[in-house]
């Protein structure tokens, strides 16, 4: 009995070695044969345009890519069948994969919602910054015009003071005009002080908004990186993993394709 088992094990080992040798030779020689069947002579391509050559290289790359994918799929399929004992995927494995996939999808959706909220907040803050900037620029223009008026009033006042120093009699209407100019000058100075204080407050508010915007940009970048990490965790396939994990990844991809077909 033990001898039969050992003989059977020896036969299975030889078969496995032969199949592995065939697979290795197929992997080594397959691309060469494919390249030999699809390669075009270099002398014939010289007379063609660069665009036509580029199209040929693209088609060749597509064929080679498909061939490599087909070879890898065949190899994984054969290794899964010829394992001793053969690898079987149970319903529990599928349920675990579905649970993991659903949890990852939920996390991805929540991250997407957070990113959308951050984007809306950034847009709102940008609009507020734009409106505040426009109002500050308008106030600056008004301040410039007020300063020009102030300079003209100061020049007129200086002229009146020079005229008064010549001991010429001041007419009542001129004296009234001087008082009016002085009161207007005081009002203008008060308005300038008010505008300066408002400009300082607006500058502080603008600096605070700029800081908030930089923080929001950092949070948006972090959320985008987390979203990309989750996507990569869902779609990443490790070529050097064991056969069982590769089959599980294959089932996961099939489930995603079915979900996409159902959503359409």
UniProtKB/Swiss-Prot annotation:
Where mainly located? nucleus
Provide this UniProt record's keywords sorted from A to Z: Cell cycle, Cell division, Centromere, Chromosome, Coiled coil, Kinetochore, Mitosis, Nucleus
Say what the protein does. Acts as a component of the outer kinetochore KNL1 complex that facilitates microtubule-kinetochore interactions and the spindle assembly checkpoint. Kinetochores, consisting of a centromere-associated inner segment and a microtubule-contacting outer segment, play a crucial role in chromosome segregation by mediating the physical connection between centromeric DNA and spindle microtubules.
Which Pfam families does the record match to this protein? Sos7 (PF20882)
The record lists the lineage as:
Eukaryota, Fungi, Dikarya, Ascomycota, Taphrinomycotina
Which Gene Ontology BP terms does the record give? attachment of mitotic spindle microtubules to kinetochore; cell division; homologous chromosome orientation in meiotic metaphase I; mitotic sister chromatid segregation; protein localization to kinetochore; regulation of meiosis I spindle assembly checkpoint; spindle attachment to meiosis I kinetochore
Q: Subunit composition?
A: Component of the KNL1/SPC105 complex composed of at least spc7 and sos7. Part of the outer kinetochore KMN network that includes the KNL1, MIS12 and NDC80 complexes. Interacts (via C-terminus) with spc7 (via C-terminus); the interaction is direct.
> In the UniProt record, does the keyword Nucleus occur?
yes
Name this polypeptide is given: Outer kinetochore KNL1 complex subunit sos7
Q: Name one GO cellular component term.
A: kinetochore
Coiled coil spans: 90-236
Instruction: Tell me where on the tree of life, at the top rank, the source sits.
Output: Eukaryota
């Amino acid at each position: 009995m033990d001898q039969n088992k050992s003989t059977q094990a020896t036969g299975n080992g030889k078969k496995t070695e032969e199949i592995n040798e065939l697979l290795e030779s197929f992997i080594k020689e397959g691309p060469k044969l494919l390249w030999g069947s699809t390669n075009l002579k270099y002398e014939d391509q010289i007379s063609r345009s660069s665009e036509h050559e580029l199209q040929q290289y693209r088609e060749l790359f597509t064929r080679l890519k498909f061939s490599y994918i087909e070879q890898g799929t065949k190899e994984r399929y054969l290794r899964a069948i010829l394992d001793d004992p053969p690898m079987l995927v149970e319903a529990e494995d599928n349920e675990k994969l579905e649970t993991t996939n659903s949890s990852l999808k939920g996390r991805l959706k929540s991250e997407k919602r957070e990113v959308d909220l951050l984007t809306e907040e950034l847009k709102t803050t940008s609009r507020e910054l734009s409106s505040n900037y426009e109002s500050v620029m308008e106030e600056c223009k008004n301040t410039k015009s007020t300063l020009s008026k102030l300079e003209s009033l100061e020049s007129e006042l200086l002229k009146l003071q020079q005229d008064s120093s010549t001991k010429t009699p001041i007419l009542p209407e001129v004296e009234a005009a001087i008082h009016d100019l002085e009161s207007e000058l005081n009002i203008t100075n008060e308005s300038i002080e008010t505008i300066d204080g408002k400009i300082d407050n607006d500058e502080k508010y603008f600096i605070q908004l700029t800081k908030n915007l930089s923080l929001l940009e950092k949070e948006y970048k972090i959320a985008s990186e987390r979203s990309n990490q989750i996507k990569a965790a869902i779609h990443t396939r490790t070529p050097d993993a064991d056969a069982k994990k590769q089959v599980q990844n294959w089932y996961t991809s099939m489930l995603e394709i079915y979900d996409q077909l159902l959503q359409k």
